[in-house]
């Protein structure tokens, strides 16, 4: 309850100070607070003032005086000179002041000038004899002639960084430093007050002794009466008698007043100001409180009424010099320096305060009088600089040392009012105008601080630290003061700015005073610190415009910006107080920090992260820090989190800056850690926490200055910080959770405001300005922005708009290019990864660093610099890496050491600095290498210190050992000084180092260990709890010490030490002004969220699961909602998926019994997110819709529906629990299993889950109308989704619908909620454009495909019916030509028909089509195609009813009624034909097939009517037909599909009648309409339709398409024969169109002929003959050439070359006729004939001899085939045995038994296959060659052919025949070859080609004789060949033996007959020429048997011989 009392006291105190302030400023708060003080003085003194009348008159006079008697704002030259005398007066005053204030003052400080305003100068209390908090720092500066000396007495001038000195030691050092500065006579900022530094003579003034401030009569009289009454009262006081000087001065003044008689006309018109002042000053110097009070009261009123001339100069007190203003030093006497009356009055009034012993009434009058001197409306007030500061000091001292709480309050209020008035005097507009003019001179002005730092950095860095910050501030003051020229025009604005600076500096110095560890809150030091901190807070808060303006400068040579001038002091304030354990101090310091963050972060861009990361975050994580500190800091963090611009700019300027800490990331991680803390809390504790949420955490109300009087403060610093009634961690957890949500809310706010920005004009200008222009115009631009904002906003709360203005007003703002920052962040992250690699394995990191550009190369210098300059490296890893012994690492180590500068350092300091950069390894060799290089570097930079480097090396090593020995806890016996001396004997080149030197080293190491400060700091932070535990023991049970506080104080010092190092590094390399990036782009939010979203997710998830209260869970849900919104907006898919997944988990829909209200709220949030962010959810829609499905299930269950009938989709996704549970249960139903087997954990879990029920309360929530409406809106508002989003939505919805169906696949009433919604969504989105519907239906179509083919018919019928309804709606929408949306949405019907074998489904779809056609036929466009494609599938059905319905629908409905509709659609006609084609090919229903063919035939007529011109058609009909044909190629698009339908039926239909009718219909159509076809179309018909009919023949020698010989026989007897004949007939009919494709026809016939099947071959031969003979008269030369080529090809293909190729000896073919024989042999002389005859006789004898041996040989072309029982004449398959026949013998009719007789048992299958293939090939080719010979014979027997064939082609044919004859003759003559073929088992018997030889010879001779007879011109060429062949044949015949070669003789006899008949028909001449040779042979023929035919031929020949020769004889 003490905390609550504290709050009440604080509120009461606030009220008191408020009332006091109100009283003090009741007339005019900003101008006349002295009236209020005057009334307070009356009450305090208890006296009746006698000046009531003059006081009232003075009030009137004051008003008039303000308007009429105000002096000019600018000082006259005389006034400026008048101010030069006050320095010496101040010095004199100080001496008196020292005597009067405290007789026992400590003289160590010399003079009170050396003390600061801060109370800590006297906090040791009066018993020590020190000054009682006289705020003298600033006033004594002026008193010593320096106006504004450097006052920071809290800086530590020592160079030591240990920070171990006590507060008193620091004060003594600071005071000594200030004393030295003042004795040195530094100019400080005296020039800014126009007070000369060393002037000893006051300049002459134009004022006279007797001239005073003139006024009207009434004012003058009132003033005289006031003064006279006061002086008379004083004179009557008994105490005045003790001071003769005062008494005399009063008497002189009264005497002077007596000269003016109010009753006479001698009315005064002026008051002698000096005379009056001297009297009152003398009165104030008395020791009488009453006299002082009266004098001070009079002075207060005089200055309040401005009755005295403040510009007059007066002598110091007790001076004997004249006050004549015109006196000069001509008489040789130097007068003492003079002061202005205002300055002298302030000195006099201030001297009246004597510390704690001062009378209360005097204290009050002092405050009143000082406020009267300072607070005035006139902006030209002369109270500036030192006087102002002295007045402030005095009032401050009254507040601190007064024993009267009321006086303390009044002093505090007055002080606040005075300071506020100082800042109110700064004219921002004037500053702006002056700044604009200055900017034209030099736009690159920098502050003196920056210039000084830059100049110092050029030589040796002067780092900013906490311990030497005071000294740095003093140095800066000197630098700024030195820039002030002696003669510069000081304006009132300059004075106002300088006063503001001085006041701020004074307050900062007071704040910086350290406090003792144990202090009373009512002590002077604490109250002083609190007041100064609150004043600084008020200054910044109430006058933030002054700090924001970069156009307010301190006057000087280099005009320093105001914010830069106070920067170091503000740093000092924060760094000295940020870690204070006192709650009020900590709070106000943190509030100041917040002001910097909220308003000045652009100016303190480098300081803010230092304080946050080095002080506040470490403190907040200390276990010893107070709960108030943690909670209050977290509350400030929450403010940051609530400010979008601050967050974004933190990220840009810190997290994306490689040289800055990741402030944003650190903050979020800190909040996440707190949010993840597991805290158990009772309901009672929670209620306590809820109660205090609305209460303020702060000790004081910061909206106004708190009353800090001693009576209003408690003595204990912990009052008000009572023990919390709830866990601290819980409070932190809840606030951190709020912070996380606030961050998200701010990011979302920034993103959406930026998406629709009302961008500030200045922002646009700024972002559009180039870099150079931005630098030039930065000052003026930022000032204009600030001015415009300030005029429109009176308050400066951190609103969004104000924040933007403030950020823009920074000096160094640059454009925030999102890409630039993204790259910076990526590079920073990459560097962090490289550092992590280095800390783990240093050597692996170097190549990575080079690759990523962090190192330019692997040179030692580059690596060494990187190791020194990079933060975050593990010092141990650096030491190990540098200490490696290989050459590369040693070189890097040397380069590393060479980077250090040890110049001027002692060896210990150098070693200490050196060892701060790495941890020294433990190995001696590594240490040795380090020390060797260190010694070399040290000696090089410090020559003369040691004689050689060895000395430094040994000494360094010795110091390392000493440091380890003295400070290691493991070493008990420490090294003594003597041992250390002995260790270092003779190391300096054989000599000892000086003993004093070594002793100093020893002592320094002993007192200050060399250690890594960073590791020490971290160890201290992590071990703060251990400090408390170490200090506690059993013996201090009764100890009253606060060990936790002591531990915290110890750690806080370490924090300060670390912060000092950070500031040191912060300013080390500063080369110019910092660039601050103001946020303006929405893309920054994306980068931030991508970086931090995992932390957000981690922070929001556990609290929701851990707590059930609405507030906490709603916060988590809000955070998730915003996160999803951000992730969706910026397409951060991983984040969006994760957050949606978390929200889905929060719904907890899988566990019915565990659903709570928070889960229902999660459902609501999820639905709201879906509605608001639907356009960006993409893949997350599925999770959401799955939840919707589960919610609908819960709603059904809540209504009483059995849960088993509504399966859970989510459970079915993993496994069907119900099925698995029931199956497991059913599997264990045996009798013994009931008791013998226990359920497994899985089964128990399934049973428990199955038995869950929904609570009534949750059922009510689940079924609420709000939830139902939200669920419905998900679908009804889908029409508002974008085109891409609706596709994502439908994808998800279809996926969920499929899962629903799968989960209830076997149910009688399957779950189809999502399926129904999918249909509904289609209706809702029916108005979408086709562009959006196309991808939409692509998804839905696939879903319907799956659903409509489901095994559950209920699902299928629902899907089909839904499709039907949707299709009816879609068909109502007009579809333009060229679009195919109807095709798309009707496609699922086709898929369903194709993949569903259910008859009912197919019938239902056919009925749907019928419905479409009957009702929407006119609207159907592209939809015809899927309808007809579907009907094609139904046409293939094996169910007659399906095929029948298809046939009726197509024939009766479509073709009859809607043929033209179909015909007009692209591709639809071909699909219509395809339906008929499929029906014709359906082998089960011949009748339907024939009906379909009939329909096709009729449709052919319809198509012909449409396509071809008919003279009987009207013009309208022609136009109608043209419209139908528009866009169509009548041949390609119309006729070809029709003809192809017939063709396909011909090729594939199984029914013979169908095939035959199709063939007839096709050729009928071709014959009927072929005349309309063009040549190109005919070519296509032939190649695509006609020739493919015979495609089975494309491979020569085999027909393997048919499964059986019966199939082949049927095909041959029907289709092939009929088709070939029709084809030839068609060719003949349309010869003109088809003749150019003769090659194709001939090639087709060649394929027919070259088949093993004898039937096919003979059909082909017959058709070829028919083709040639029917068109013989139409062929041209080209055609005959093609025919010749065909015969060439046929003879070549049918030549059995295998007979020679497979000779085992490979001897090849041997010619049986000598090649030397020429055509002229027959015409040679008889000698040659006789020689030839002899040769022939010998050949004949050989032939006869061989013939006897081969009589039993087998004729391949005749006998072999004939042995097959006439198979070649049948149409029943292969004519020769196959491999299969050989391996698996069949009946004799299908195989050759002789083959297997000679087969070897060990012959492999491969050999058998090869042998049979060879034999088959030989037989087939020989047979076919005989057919070709026969064909030629028949052709030449035709007179037309013989007449039409060109001679060239006829000769070509004779060559073929001659070649065949010679081939067979050569083979027959090579008896050895034939024998070898038998031995090689190529054939079974010795083969011969007798039939081929005789047939070829016969046909050849016949053709040649015809040619001879028909062509007289060519006889000469022909006769020679003819005679040669005839002679050869006859000679061969004659040589045959009648007894042994009867078969050969019989074979050749017909040839001999033909030869003789031919000879008979020779011309007489030719007969005469060639008959002699033949005559001899004929005579030999008679030796043989001569049958009748031969006898008749011989008779004719001999008769012709007789006629020729006998007649001549």
Curated annotation (Swiss-Prot):
Record's compositionally biased regions (Acidic residues): 91-118, 144-154, 166-184
Region (HDS1 domain): 1017-1220
Pfam assignment, any one: Sec7-like_HDS
Positions carrying Phosphothreonine: 334, 1240
Subcellular location(s) of the protein: Cytoplasm; Golgi apparatus; Golgi apparatus, trans-Golgi network; Cytoplasmic vesicle, COPI-coated vesicle membrane
Residue ranges, annotated region (C2 domain-interacting region (CIR)): 1836-1883
GO CC terms: COPI-coated vesicle membrane; cytosol; ER to Golgi transport vesicle membrane; Golgi-associated vesicle; late endosome; trans-Golgi network
SEC7 domain boundaries: 824-1010
Keywords: Cytoplasm, Cytoplasmic vesicle, Golgi apparatus, Isopeptide bond, Membrane, Phosphoprotein, Protein transport, Transport, Ubl conjugation
Comp. bias (Low complexity): 134-143, 155-165, 210-220, 771-788
Record keyword Ubl conjugation present: yes
Residues covered by region (Disordered): 1-220, 771-814, 1708-1803
Covalent cross-link Glycyl lysine isopeptide (Lys-Gly) (interchain with G-Cter in ubiquitin) as placed by the record, residue numbers: 797
Motif HUS box, chain ranges: 653-657
Polar residues biased stretches: 17-33, 194-209, 1708-1723, 1764-1777
Source species, domain of life: Eukaryota
One GO term of the biological process aspect: autophagosome assembly
Record-listed Mg(2+) binding positions: 940
Record remark: domains: The highly charged acidic domain may serve a structural role to interact with lipids or proteins on the cytoplasmic surface of the Golgi apparatus.
Subunit relationships: Interacts with ARF1. Interacts (via C-terminus) with RSP5 ubiquitin ligase.
The protein's name: ADP-ribosylation factor guanine nucleotide-exchange factor SEC7
Gene name of the record: SEC7
